[in-house]
């Protein structure tokens, strides 16, 4: 699916509202395999998630470090689940003045498990839930944070998943679920 912006809402630059689709079609015609996250999501592929392996990618970003953790199929790199971990630089004083709950905290910016979308009224299989991707990604990110000298983890969590973090010793501080490491 494409998340188009209506052409009437584009104020400057190209007024093509389906630019991603056009670029993808052009690359497809040239037999270029797309390997961005959107094209590697499980979607309707038949990969077996029980064959997934964890992968950890580390890179420098904006006066800190980022870690991108994924559970991927070892054959074709299909992504079943991902987590983005931010280790802010220790000298980000202006951020800590505004958000003191983030002082000395590593931050889970995103965590997501992909599966097929369901039709209205269709039952969701609990199979995915029991694979434990989230639990393993969170535990791995906590270990990375601790090894890098952070003494707490903060998670930007939707209200309806806060119970999940509470079961893992997180508590609410302002808008973040926070845990001492």
Give the label of every model feature segment.
Residues 1-105, 109, 127-129:
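C-terminal scaffold of the Radical SAM
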Residues 89, 114-117, 161:
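Feature marks short, surface-exposed loop/turn motifs that line or immediately flank catalytic pockets
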Residues 105, 151-154, 176:
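Beta-sheet entry/capping signal
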Residues 111-129:
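A short, internal acetyl-CoA/4′-phosphopantetheine-binding micro-motif in the GNAT/acyltransferase core
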Residues 113-117, 142-146, 169-170:
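Hydrophobic alpha-helix feature that most strongly marks membrane-spanning transmembrane helices
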Residues 124-145:
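Conserved acetyl-CoA-binding loop-helix of GNAT-fold acetyltransferases
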Residues 143-157:
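Conserved GNAT acetyl-CoA-binding A-motif
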Residues 156-181:
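Active-site/acyl-donor-binding loops of N-acyltransferases
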């Amino acid at each position: 699916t494409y998340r188009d912006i209506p052409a009437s809402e584009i104020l400057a630059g190209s007024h093509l509202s389906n630019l991603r689709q056009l670029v993808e079609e052009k690359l497809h015609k040239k037999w270029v395999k797309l390997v961005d996250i959107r094209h590697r999501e499980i979607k309707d592929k038949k990969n077996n998630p029980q064959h997934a392996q964890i992968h950890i990618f580390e890179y420098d970003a904006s006066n800190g470090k980022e870690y991108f953790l994924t559970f991927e199929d070892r054959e074709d790199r299909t992504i079943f689940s991902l987590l983005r971990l931010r280790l802010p630089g220790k000298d980000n004083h202006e951020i800590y003045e505004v958000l003191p709950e983030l002082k000395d905290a590593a931050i889970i910016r995103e965590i997501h498990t992909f599966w097929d979308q369901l039709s209205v009224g269709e039952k969701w299989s609990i199979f995915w839930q029991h694979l434990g991707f989230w639990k393993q990604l969170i535990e791995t990110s906590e270990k990375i944070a601790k090894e890098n000298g952070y003494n707490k983890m903060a998670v930007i969590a939707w209200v309806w998943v806060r119970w999940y973090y509470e079961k893992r010793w997180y508590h609410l501080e302002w808008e973040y679920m926070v845990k001492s490491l």
